[in-house]
Each structure stands twice: as structure tokens, then as C-alpha cells.
């Protein structure tokens, strides 16, 4: 026999589900799904669930958090939609249309109040007040549940605040409610991209382009191309190239992204280490200051261009080329442009 004290306490996820069930039962009474004769039984059931799971159905904030502005019925309809599998025997077009319509979650109709909340959420987004925007969109969704525009907007707010999984959930629900709403596909693509689900992001952008028609918008096509590059890079196991590296900086790179030191060598007279009066490079690199500079050059090859333009280093190179001696290291490193490397 299991003692009551040995029973684990309900998890937060279980508590949220309990609140969602209580809310569903309450809504079923209000919308006429259940009759007034069932009211007493439903109230007893709600009380038992609340006591057992240690939740308070009168806590509006907790109920809102549990449902995210949705209803248990709409959430379940999405689950049914996503788990739907094609039957072994193809159904007629009419039967398929009826099945899709029956399982399609219904978008709540916007009201002046919900649209006002959406506009306030948009303003909060413009001010980068993402938490406030999320709350305002959630309030709008409580008035018009499963509205794809409100869901898509909240997905954008979640993405902006770094909550990519929640963004993907909202955007995916919006695409189920209205598969033709291209903005929801775009935000689903972004959320999946930020979660490193590049194949999922590619699928979302492709669906978005299909929904837009005419080959899709430039923004949607850019998202798709970026995602395709990520997939190719992942398949190659290579790091992505930096988009902001210009041709001049790129030309200063050797194989594997290492800086091309041929320009430095030519500036020093074209001689190898130790030849024609040139000091052995190994002795130079044993100097910790130069070793640090070399590490910085390898991590940021663009610095090589600045190094080539340094007049003090250029004078040193000319002296080397004429067989001159090594400069004083302390005076060389006192040059701010070198000391900061």
C-alpha cells in the first residue's frame, strides 16, 4: 500500500494542465456544451481537481499562464491536426475537406478591444518592451483565442526576447489555424532557425513562399537561402563565412582563414628567415609581445591591412631590406597601433 506521504507532489506542468482542465469544464458550462443539470457535478469535479493538484482556479494570472491565452479545446485540436496521418486508402476529396475542416482550430474573431490590445502590443514592440508586448498580445488572445495575427505577433515578441521555443509554438499554431497566413510561416522559420533546426526552418520558409505566391517576397527568399547555406555548412562541417568581410580583407587570408603573410614578407625584402641579414623568425616569435600580435592576426586577419600601413613598421622593413639591424623592441611596441594589437 502506498502511503500518501510517499506520493510525489504535482509538477508545475501537471498543475497547469489541471488548471486547463478546470477552465475547459467551466467553459463547457458557459457555452452550453453541458446543461445546467450538469452544473453541480461539474463544480464538484472542479473542486476535487483543484484540491488534489493544489491549484486555485480563481487565480486569473495562473490560469492565463497555464493556457497562454488559448483554450484547452483549441490546443487539443492542434494536436489532432498534427498527429493526423493519411489513411491506407485515399479518401475522396469531399471526405478529406470535411475531415480537415472538422479538425481545423477556429480563429477567434477580433474585437475592437482585442485589436486595441494588439496595437498597444505593436507599440511596445517598437519600444523594445518585449515582456509588455507579450502580455498585451496574450490579453488579445484571451478575447480572440487562436487568432493567427495575434499568435504571429506574440511569436515575434517571443523571438525578440530570446524565447524561441515559445515563438515556434505560437507561430506553428498560427499556421495550423490559417495556412495561408505567410507571416506566420516567416516567424516559424525564424524561430526554428534560432533553435538551430535548419531543416525545419527551410520547410517553414518554403511553405511561406508557397502561401505568398508569385515566387515569394524578397525577405522570405532571403530567409530560405540563408537556411539552405546553414544546412550546407552543417553537412560540410564548416564554419559559415562572415557576410561582412569585404574582398580586400578576404584577399589577406590564406588557406583555412589564416592571414596571408606574403605581403608582410615582400615588405621585408622578400627574404626568408635568417637570410640576407634578416633575423630568424623563430627568434622574433619567441618574443611574447610578437606572439600575442600573431595570435591576434590569426583571429582577425583584417588587422594585417592596418599593420601594412604602419609607418614605423614600414621603416623597420626598409632597414631590414638594406641589411640594417633589428629595431629597439621597447620603442617599437610604444607605437599605440601596435601596442593595442
Curated annotation (Swiss-Prot):
TPR repeats lie at residues 114-147, 148-181, 182-215. GO terms for cellular component: membrane; TRC complex. It comes from the Eukaryota. GO terms for molecular function: identical protein binding; molecular adaptor activity; protein serine/threonine phosphatase activity. SUPFAM superfamilies: TPR-like. Residues 86-123, 232-280 are annotated as: Disordered. SMART domains: STI1, TPR. It is found in: Cytoplasm. Its main location: cytoplasm. Residues 269-278 have a biased composition (Gly residues). Keywords: Chaperone, Cytoplasm, Repeat, TPR repeat. InterPro entries: SGT, SGTA_dimer, STI1_HS-bd, TPR-like_helical_dom_sf, TPR_rpt. Changing residue 183 to A: Impairs binding to HSC proteins. GO terms for biological process: post-translational protein targeting to endoplasmic reticulum membrane; response to heat. Forms homodimers. Component of the get4/get5/sgt2 sorting complex. Dimers of sgt2 bind directly a single get5. Binds HSC family members ssa1, sse1, hsp104 and hsc82 via its TPR domain. Belongs to the SGT family. The tetratrico-repeat (TPR) region has the ability to directly bind multiple HSC family members including ssa1, sse1, hsp104 and hsc82. Heat-shock protein cognate (HSC) co-chaperone that preferentially binds endoplasmic reticulum-destined tail-anchored (TA) proteins and directs them to the GET (guided entry of TA proteins) pathway via get4 and get5. Get4 and get5 form an obligate complex that catalyzes the transfer of tail-anchored proteins destined to the endoplasmic reticulum from sgt2 to the cytosolic targeting factor which then targets the TA protein to the ER membrane via get1/get2. This is Heat-shock protein cognate (HSC) co-chaperone sgt12. The lineage of its organism: Eukaryota, Fungi, Dikarya, Ascomycota, Pezizomycotina. The gene is sgt12.
Amino acid at each position: 500500500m502506498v502511503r500518501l506521504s510517499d506520493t510525489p507532489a504535482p509538477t508545475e506542468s501537471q498543475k497547469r494542465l489541471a488548471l486547463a482542465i478546470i477552465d475547459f469544464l467551466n467553459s463547457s458550462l458557459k457555452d452550453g456544451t453541458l446543461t445546467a443539470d450538469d452544473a453541480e457535478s461539474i463544480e464538484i469535479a472542479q473542486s476535487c481537481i483543484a484540491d488534489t493538484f493544489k491549484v486555485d482556479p480563481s487565480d486569473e494570472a495562473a490560469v492565463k499562464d497555464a493556457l497562454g491565452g488559448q483554450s484547452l479545446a483549441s490546443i487539443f485540436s492542434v494536436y489532432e491536426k498534427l498527429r493526423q496521418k493519411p489513411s491506407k486508402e485515399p479518401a475522396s476529396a469531399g471526405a478529406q475537406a470535411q475531415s480537415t475542416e472538422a479538425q481545423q482550430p477556429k480563429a477567434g474573431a477580433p474585437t475592437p478591444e482585442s485589436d486595441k490590445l494588439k496595437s498597444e502590443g505593436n507599440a511596445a514592440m517598437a519600444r523594445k518592451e518585449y515582456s509588455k508586448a507579450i502580455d498585451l498580445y496574450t490579453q488579445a488572445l484571451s478575447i480572440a483565442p487562436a487568432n493567427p495575427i495575434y499568435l504571429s505577433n506574440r511569436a515575434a515578441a517571443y523571438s525578440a526576447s530570446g524565447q524561441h521555443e515559445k515563438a515556434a509554438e505560437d507561430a506553428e499554431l498560427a499556421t495550423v489555424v490559417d495556412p495561408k497566413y505567410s507571416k506566420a510561416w516567416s516567424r516559424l522559420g525564424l524561430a526554428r532557425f534560432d533553435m538551430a533546426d535548419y531543416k525545419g526552418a527551410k520547410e517553414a520558409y518554403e511553405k511561406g513562399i508557397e502561401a505568398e505566391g508569385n515566387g515569394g517576397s524578397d525577405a522570405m527568399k532571403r530567409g530560405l537561402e540563408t537556411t539552405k547555406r546553414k544546412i550546407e555548412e552543417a553537412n560540410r562541417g564548416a564554419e559559415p563565412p562572415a557576410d561582412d568581410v569585404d574582398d580586400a580583407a578576404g584577399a589577406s587570408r590564406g588557406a583555412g582563414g589564416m592571414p596571408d603573410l606574403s605581403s608582410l614578407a615582400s615588405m621585408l625584402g622578400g627574404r626568408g628567415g635568417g637570410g640576407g641579414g634578416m633575423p630568424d623568425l623563430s627568434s622574433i616569435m619567441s618574443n611574447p609581445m610578437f606572439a600575442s600580435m600573431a595570435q591576434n592576426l590569426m583571429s582577425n586577419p583584417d588587422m594585417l591591412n592596418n599593420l601594412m600601413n604602419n609607418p614605423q613598421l614600414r621603416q623597420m622593413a626598409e632597414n631590414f631590406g638594406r641589411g640594417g639591424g633589428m629595431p629597439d623592441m621597447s620603442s617599437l611596441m610604444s607605437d599605440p597601433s601596435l601596442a593595442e594589437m
